[in-house]
Amino acid sequence: MDMVWIVLAVGAGACLALQASANGSLRGNLADPRYAAFFSICGTIVTAIVVMLFLRPSPPSLNAIRSAPWWNWIGGPLGALIVLAGAALTPKLGAAAFIAAMVGGQLFCSLLLDHFGFMNVPQQGLTLGRLTGAMMVFAGVVLVKYW
């Protein structure tokens, strides 16, 4: 079953590369990465509304919303920054280098989240194997950009 989840994650990664490239192109047409990010996020909102109207999930209780820790609510602002970064940086770095750098940043942050168990992530220590894998990814970032 893990393989299904991995394939879905790879598909999501492909979507990230497509999104960054589309937003970078839109930035060129609109001459401003902020507008490219704005219109991309508007598309996200419309898509989310259509999905919610179609699937009609039960709403969470007010108590569940109120009791959520503050860091549960940073996904939206962080998503906006990611979209803006894609629109601004993909035309400068190229799609592969931008995504490679994003993956490097994601991996570094993920290792910290895992090691310390932040944000309810299951705690997994930083092992030599995990550190070596991360270093190989960072080497890949350099290779993708410069070779």
Enumerate the predicted regions with their spans.
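Membrane-interface interhelical linkers
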Residues: 1-11, 25-28, 45-73, 93, ...
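Transmembrane alpha-helical segments of integral membrane proteins
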Residues: 108-118
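Hydrophobic/aromatic residues within the transmembrane alpha-helices of Major Facilitator Superfamily
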Residues: 14, 18, 46, 77, ...
